[in-house]
């Protein structure tokens, strides 16, 4: 299948969203040296992609879906759209991308009132969507280290859990010259998520405070020391996460008319990447219409919602102090990618209309109820997946989505990462600051069949019979 291997290479530059300054892509840059704003990466030769027809691009990407070439099996199936400067030998693949889109169970679909599906990004290698961006960021670092013969590069990130798990996993796989350090807000990462960077051998540091505090520390490091920052300020990560848009379009046979995407905002990197990806597809004619994109935020961390809720001429950006949220990955009061969101949302609305991009607010109670309801119907949604379902329900109630449309919800991580919140719900143990009261219809707890002493007091046959009888009575079974 050598005919599917990329032959087109490009030149790339960092483009500052503040002063429009440009810098070469072969350097570790995260913010503009001139004005301090964030970057987007741009392929200077992007116009050359128009030399191939939209139909040919679709056919090529469909052919690559069957490829056994390692460099094309993950997010780099869309190599020319992502990072066409990289060499195949540097591309890192751990099984990321190409995550399943699972239609809502019929009973759940009927409850909600329109056709929708989950894209299960929790089925990435580290069990979250972050692997899309890390695959690109680490491929770039391999390429850069090889070009410069660097002997050691420290990769650093602040995290609420998923970023650290992903960064540590990819650093462990690549190995020298890369080493991983992660900084976490003490006590605000689930035990399941904490176990991941520890298991991958990263240096794990904890800091009192919240994610925003950790972010300021690693930003200071990146500005004053030669380290590789792996948060979404890293523009290479945004490129890898664009693959979500490309996969979504390809799965729907490049027809995204009447499709509404619901995406948790968090640090705003993912919604940035998805808009950027669809804008590229639209510019090249691979999709004829843009899907509508709804960012979703909890009322406990909703700066982007507040910005867009204001009249257009009265909007001012204002970070917020976050309150505890079960959607931990989205519990960010000052998302670093907001300047990208604002810039790309302008372009997205210009191309798709005023209703093409909107932000929805949800309550913590709605997030937990929606997550449990989804998983009660056979899904594996995390709290962010619950946030998206709650956003869909609210959008329907507000008349922002019609029942003739279809929706795709982003389950950013695997539900097992948030088993602790499920346990708090089932045992009614949430602290008052969350504002969550369990719905008895969604709560679930194990029931004891026999007292613990029964195992030692009864012979095997009697023990089995007594347990079976207790089970039959509990389940109201009728004898044959």
What residue spans do the PLM features occupy?
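N-terminal juxtadomain amphipathic helix
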Residues: 2-93
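Positively charged, low-complexity intrinsically disordered leader regions
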Residues: 71-147
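Active-site/ligand-binding loops adjacent to catalytic centers
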Residues: 98, 193-195, 205, 209-229, ...
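Short glycine/serine/threonine-rich phosphate/pyrophosphate-binding segments
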Residues: 131-137, 156-174, 190-192, 267-274, ...
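Alpha-helix C-terminal capping segments
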Residues: 139-147, 165-177, 279, 390-400
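A short, small-residue-rich loop immediately preceding and capping a beta-strand
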Residues: 147-170, 177-185, 257-267, 293, ...
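Active-site/ligand-binding-proximal alpha/beta "capping" segment
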Residues: 221-285, 368-373
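Claisen-condensing/thiolase-fold acyl-transfer catalytic domains that form or cleave C-C bonds
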Residues: 263, 364-421
């Amino acid at each position: 299948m050598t005919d599917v291997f990329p032959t087109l290479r490009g030149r790339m530059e960092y483009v500052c969203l503040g002063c429009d300054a440009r810098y070469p892509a072969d350097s570790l840059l995260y913010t503009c040296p001139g004005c301090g704003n964030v970057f987007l990466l741009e392929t200077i030769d992007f116009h050359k992609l128009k030399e191939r027809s939209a139909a040919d691009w679709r056919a090529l990407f469909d052919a690559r879906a069957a490829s056994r070439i390692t460099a094309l099996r993950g997010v780099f199936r869309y190599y020319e759209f992502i990072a066409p400067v990289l060499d195949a030998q540097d591309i890192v693949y751990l099984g990321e991308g190409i995550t399943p889109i699972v239609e809502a169970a019929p009973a759940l679909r009927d409850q909600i009132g329109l056709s929708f599906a989950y894209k299960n990004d929790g089925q990435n290698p580290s069990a979250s969507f972050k692997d899309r961006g890390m695959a690109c960021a680490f491929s770039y670092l391999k390429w850069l280290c090889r070009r410069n013969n660097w002997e050691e590069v420290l990769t650093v990130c602040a995290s609420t859990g998923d970023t650290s798990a992903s960064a540590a996993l990819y650093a462990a796989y690549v190995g020298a010259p890369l080493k991983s350090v992660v900084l976490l807000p003490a006590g605000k990462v689930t035990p399941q998520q904490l176990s991941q960077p520890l298991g991958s051998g990263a240096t794990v540091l904890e800091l009192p405070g919240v994610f925003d505090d950790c972010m300021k520390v690693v930003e200071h490091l990146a500005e004053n020391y030669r380290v590789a920052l792996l948060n979404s300020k890293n523009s290479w990560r945004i490129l890898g996460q664009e693959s979500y848009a490309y996969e979504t379009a390809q799965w729907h046979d490049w027809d995204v008319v009447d499709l509404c995407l619901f995406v948790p905002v968090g640090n705003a990197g993912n919604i940035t990447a998805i808009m950027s990806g669809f804008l590229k597809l639209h510019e090249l004619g691979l999709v004829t219409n843009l899907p509508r994109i709804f960012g979703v935020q909890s009322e406990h961390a909703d700066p982007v919602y507040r910005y867009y809720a204001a009249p257009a001429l009265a909007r001012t950006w204002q970070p917020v102090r976050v309150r505890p949220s079960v959607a931990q990955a989205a519990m960010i009061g000052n998302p670093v990618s907001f300047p990208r969101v604002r810039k790309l949302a302008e372009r997205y609305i210009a191309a798709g209309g005023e209703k093409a991009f909107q932000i929805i607010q949800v309550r913590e109670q709605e997030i937990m109820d929606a997550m449990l309801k989804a998983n009660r119907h056979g899904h594996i949604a995390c709290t962010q997946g619950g946030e998206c379902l709650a956003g869909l329900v609210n959008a329907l109630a507000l008349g922002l989505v019609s029942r003739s449309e279809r929706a795709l919800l982003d389950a950013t991580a695997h539900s097992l990462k948030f088993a602790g919140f499920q346990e708090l719900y089932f045992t009614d143990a949430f602290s008052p600051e969350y504002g969550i009261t369990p719905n008895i219809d969604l709560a679930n707890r194990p029931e004891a069949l026999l007292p613990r002493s029964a195992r030692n007091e009864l012979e095997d046959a009697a023990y089995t019979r007594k347990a079976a009888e207790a089970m039959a009575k509990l389940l109201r079974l009728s004898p044959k």
